[in-house]
Every structure is written in C-alpha cells, then in structure tokens.
From Swiss-Prot:
GO terms for biological process: negative regulation of DNA-templated transcription. SUPFAM superfamilies: GAF domain-like, Winged helix' DNA-binding domain. One of its GO terms (molecular function) is DNA binding. HAMAP family: HrcA. Keywords: Repressor, Stress response, Transcription, Transcription regulation. The keyword Zinc-finger does not apply. InterPro entries: GAF-like_dom_sf (IPR029016), HrcA (IPR002571), HrcA_C (IPR021153), WH-like_DNA-bd_sf (IPR036388), WH_DNA-bd_sf (IPR036390), WHTH_transcript_rep_HrcA_IDD (IPR023120). This is Heat-inducible transcription repressor HrcA.
Length: 348
C-alpha cells in the first residue's frame, strides 16, 4: 500500500503513531492514540487501522501484546507529510539559536576551521544529534598563494593557501636537480598568473600548457608544469564531526555495542565522504531515512542535510546524523537555518 492510497483517517492515525513514538520510544497502543489525539472513533477501530498499517509495512509489533512502532516506511510518510503540509514554524527558541550562531560566525569568518567547528558544535548542541560539515572542495575555492619548499633531493612540500584561508600541505616527488631558487621562481609564476582563479581553472590551464610544451618546448618545462598540477590536486578529506557525547545519552543508543558501532562509523572518514557523495548539493534540505541510504553503515540512522553556498556557488554540505526516531520538524528547520546562516557569512 502506497502513501497515496491511504485515506485521511488512516494518515492521521499513522502520523499520530509516529509522532507519539518520536516523543517517547515505547510501542504505541490504540487507546493511547485515541485519548491523546481525540479521535472520534473507538480504540478498536484505531487498532484495526493500525493492524492494516502493519500489514502494509508502515508499522511493526515488537511483542504480541504490545503496541506498534514505526518502520522506515512510516518515517518517510511522516517526513513527506511535514513537507506537504508545510508544518514548519520557527519557535522563539530556534530564532535565538540562529541569531547567536550568526553573531558567532561573523566573528569567525576569516578562520574557516573555527567557522565550521562552531557550526557543527552549535548544530549538535541545539539538536542533541551528530553535527557534520563537509568543507569546501579545494577545486571550488580560489588560489591565494602557493609555496614550494625543498624537503629532500627528490621531494618538495607544496603549501597551498586558498581564498578561504584553508592551508593544504602536500609532499610531491620531483627531479633531484631542481633547486630552491627554481622552486621560488615557479611559485612566483603560479602566484602571478593564477592568483584568484579556482584550482579547477588552474589545473585545466596547466593541462593545456603541458600539451603545448611537449610540442614546442623542452621536457624540463613539461615536468615543472606537471609538478604544479600534482601540487594542486587534493582528495576531499575535511569533514568536521561534533556531538558524540550528546547521542551517548539517547535511549536509541543505550546498547553499548550499538554505541561502539556508531563510534566506529563516524570515525571512518572514507564512509563519511561516501555519505556526502550521495547527498546532492541542490537548494533543498534532504532527508535520508534508514534503508534509503546507499551507504550500508548508515542505515541505522536518519540523515538531514543541506548545502551551503558562497553567493550562488555550492561549496559543501552540513548535516545531522541521528536515530530514525528523530524530531524531524525541529531538525529540518535547524539544518536549513544553519545552512542559510553559513551561506550568508561566506557571501558577505
């Protein structure tokens, strides 16, 4: 049975079950629903509706005599219902959280590491879930300065600073004959010709130059340009995670083994990057629930994510990771508001 095939009463019962379970992680009974939500039918009718919802895969019954709990399918219905009904209204408390965050971010705008650390910590503090932020991909940022430092005969440290103030170091292999003086000249060439251009633009131009030099100039120039190209290639690896302390106290993670599993998952940078790869950087908040996640290790969680930008250019993503039994209305509003606040800070 699809959501669109549910009648209005059934939808209201399903919404009530999910909302009740989010508020209190105990199986929900028909009598409780009837009293709390004031349904004008008897508890037996509600029980029959809940039984039909179980058959349709929206609810499950942990014990024969117990009430029902939502499945991933029920949480998806609940989230879609929230969006369709536009059940979003910022409370005074949420407005204060955003105002305080905006003030803090303005003070930190010249220190990207502190900026994103503050964002994830504040997001986690406000929700009691894990706050995550994927920093801007190096390719999307503009070059501020590059320096080359000879480390060993055939090794050079490339120090790349982008327009966001993020510093990247990389060790690259070079031909042994190159001197520090030549490296300084090379850095001057890059800084003079490519300052303010994105790393992608620089690499594209270097590829063209390398092809030309192979035809017209000597191999030495080609090698130098290849070294520049390698120096400007970085894998995307900067992910900030805050709030493990908060989820430790959620009843959803009271099992010590489950908590260890969570800790192992969020410490795996490869998995975190894989998670972000599956979140498109469009204009909308995205909610991924349990089994919907293509990354198997995250199927015990729900993810709420939103892109942040600099003006109209998407730079990265911020996200919440929490239990499927999540306060979706509040979490969606906060993630959306945090992303907008970060965008304003980066765009001003």
């Amino acid at each position: 049975m699809r959501d669109t095939m549910l009648d209005e009463r059934t939808k209201k019962v399903l919404y009530a079950v999910v909302e009740s379970y989010i508020e209190k992680p105990e199986p929900v009974g028909s009598r409780y629903i009837m009293k709390k939500y004031g349904f004008d039918v008897c508890s037996a009718t509600i029980r029959n509706i809940m039984s039909d919802l179980e058959d349709a895969g929206f609810l499950s019954q942990p014990h024969t005599s117990a009430g029902r709990v939502p499945t991933d399918k029920a949480y998806r219905f609940y989230v879609d219902y929230i969006f369709q009904s536009e059940l979003f209204s910022q409370s005074l408390e949420i407005k204060r959280v955003i105002e305080n965050l905006t003030k803090k971010l303005r003070k930190l705008r010249n220190n990207m590491n502190s900026l994103f650390l503050e964002t994830t910590q504040s997001l986690s503090q406000a929700t009691r879930y894990l706050g995550l932020a994927l920093l801007p991909a190096t390719e999307k940022t503009a070059l501020h300065r590059v320096d080359f430092i000879k480390f060993k005969d055939d090794l050079v440290i490339a120090v790349v600073v982008n327009d966001k103030g993020i510093v990247k170091n990389k060790i690259i292999k070079v031909y042994p004959e190159i001197t520090q003086k030549e490296l300084n000249s090379l850095a001057d060439f890059v800084n003079r010709n490519y300052h303010g251009k994105t790393i992608d633009e620089i690499r594209d131009d270097l590829i063209v130059r390398i092809k030309k030099e192979k035809i017209f100039w000597d191999r030495l120039i080609s090698k130098i340009l290849k070294m520049c190209q390698e120096a400007l290639y970085f894998s995307r690896e900067d992910v900030y995670v805050s709030g493990f302390y908060h989820i430790m106290h959620l009843p959803d993670f009271s099992d010590i083994e489950k908590l260890r599993e969570v800790a192992k998952t969020i410490q795996d940078r490869h998995l975190l990057l894989k998670l972000f790869e599956n979140i498109s950087e469009d204009d909308e908040v995205k909610v991924i629930i349990g089994q919907e996640n293509p990354v198997e290790e995250f199927r015990s969680f729900s993810i709420i994510a939103s892109p942040y930008k600099e003006k109209d250019k998407s730079l990265g993503v911020i996200a919440l990771v929490g239990p499927k039994r999540m306060n979706y209305q509040r979490a969606i509003m906060l993630v959306n508001a945090f992303a907008r606040s970060l965008t304003r800070t980066l765009s001003d």
